[in-house]
Regions:
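Post-Walker A helix-loop "phosphate-sensing" segment adjacent to the P-loop in P-loop NTPases
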Residues: 86, 109-119
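Pre-Walker A (pre-P-loop) alpha-helix and adjacent loop at the N terminus of AAA/AAA+ ATPase modules
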Residues: 45-90
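Walker A/P-loop nucleotide-binding motif
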Residues: 86-103
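Loop/turn-to-beta-strand initiation segments
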Residues: 88, 116-117, 150-153
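Interdomain "pre-motor" coupling segment immediately N-terminal to P-loop NTPase/helicase cores
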Residues: 2-43
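Conserved nucleotide-sensing/catalytic segment adjacent to the nucleotide-binding pocket
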Residues: 131-178
Length: 178
């Protein structure tokens, strides 16, 4: 008796990954992403534009917060759709409470659902792990350090709120360029 009758638990059908193997990968990367629970709530299905004002315009862009949110969601979908073909970075910035983390989680969920590996850390968590791996030679931190550089997408939340020093600057530069 096989768990998957299609591939007979080999994980492959005609040299290609079976749906069961792909799902196992997705389950594993979700478990490693640090955001599994929150993605049940924070995803594109639950994204609401009615939170954003259509009236108040940003004097620099001339766009309302509603239009800015629409543009940001569009850019996120472009990023997701082109993820395999055009590797690039996304940077969300703005005031507290405008939806940056929510939108980041929407992107993370879509990529995780497509089998990509995504790891989420706050800036503080990221630099703490990196410093433990470098200075304390902590084995768990070293393993996580490697995952940071091997993942398909690294999400760094609240970047700019941490204490900036030469170590955090050099490590951020290393993460972004790897």
């Amino acid at each position: 008796v096989y768990t998957c009758p299609d591939c007979k638990d080999s994980g492959y059908i005609d040299g290609k990954k079976c749906h069961c193997f792909k799902q196992a990968i997705i389950n594993t990367v979700y478990a490693q992403s640090n955001i599994r629970q929150i993605l049940r709530i924070e995803n594109f299905d639950n994204f609401r534009y009615d939170f954003y004002s259509k009236e108040e315009k940003n004097p620099l862009t001339g766009l309302s917060s509603y239009e800015t949110a629409q543009k940001a969601v569009r850019e996120c979908h472009y990023f997701i759709d082109d993820f395999d073909h055009k590797p690039k970075n996304l940077l969300f910035y703005g005031k507290t409470g405008v939806g940056k983390t929510f939108l980041t989680n929407c992107v993370a969920k879509e990529l995780l659902d497509h089998g990509y590996s995504v790891i989420y850390f706050t800036a503080f968590q990221l630099f703490d792990i990196l410093s433990k791996g470098v200075f304390e030679k902590d084995s768990d931190a070293i393993a996580t350090h490697q995952n940071i550089f091997d993942c398909d997408l690294l999400v760094i939340d609240d970047l700019g709120t941490e204490l900036i020093n030469s170590f955090t600057s050099s490590q951020l530069f290393l993460c972004v360029n790897e």
